[in-house]
């Protein structure tokens, strides 16, 4: 692609666990703006052939800035995990139990492949929304309550259920289709 050749772009099918090619093709030239999106896009090992002066790096993460009270702050990992549970359920066919089970591996991958490079970004964008937990509650509760009590993931599901009950539920009909929250809830006007 960087040599100007046309390439076929794959999409990852999470239900099948593999990438698929469906005829989406792309050719770029020296005037094309190339946007690399994804959690690994800041890793310089992925783009050594692109000069540093030609890159503008943006780090996007849900950096929660609210607290339950004066003493109990909300970890950004809870926001990200709730988003992931809902997204995985809606788009990947994973149960909350499966997502919670994978979470330690996801966190280890972040520590190794994402967080070391976040400081290299030219700008950081906080994607957390002040009203987000109130909306996530409506989606997360039924998914989290399906985790069986006798499985190892139940304590985490129970903790998250207790946590989101602090927020008055807000129905997502109030959320416009252009909101980034729609990436997780569904109903977006954008194609992912």
Protein language model regions, located:
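Conserved NTP phosphate-binding and transfer environment spanning the P-loop NTPase/kinase superfamily
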Residues: 44-192
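ATP-dependent small-molecule kinase phosphotransfer cores
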Residues: 1-34, 94-103
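Structural recognition of the conserved hydrophobic beta-strand(s) that form the central parallel beta-sheet
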Residues: 33-37, 58-59
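Short beta->alpha connector loops
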Residues: 39-42
């Amino acid at each position: 692609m960087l040599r100007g050749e046309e390439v076929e772009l794959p999409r990852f099918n999470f239900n099948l666990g593999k990438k698929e090619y469906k005829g989406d093709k792309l050719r770029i030239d020296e005037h094309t703006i190339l946007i690399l999106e994804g959690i690994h896009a800041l890793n310089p090992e992925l783009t050594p052939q692109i000069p540093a002066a030609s890159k503008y790096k943006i780090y996007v993460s849900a950096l929660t800035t609210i607290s339950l009270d004066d003493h109990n702050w909300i970890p950004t990992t809870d926001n990200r995990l709730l988003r992931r549970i809902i997204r995985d359920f809606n788009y990947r066919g994973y149960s909350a139990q499966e997502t919670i089970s994978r979470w330690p591996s996801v966190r280890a991958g972040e520590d190794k492949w994402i967080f070391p490079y976040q400081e290299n970004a030219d700008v950081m964008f906080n994607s957390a929304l002040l009203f987000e937990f109130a909306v996530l509650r409506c989606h997360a509760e039924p998914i989290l309550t399906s985790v069986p009590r006798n499985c190892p993931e139940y304590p985490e599901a129970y903790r998250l259920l207790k946590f989101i009950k602090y927020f008055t539920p807000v129905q997502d009909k109030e959320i416009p289709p252009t909101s980034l929250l729609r990436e997780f809830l569904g109903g977006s006007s954008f194609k992912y």
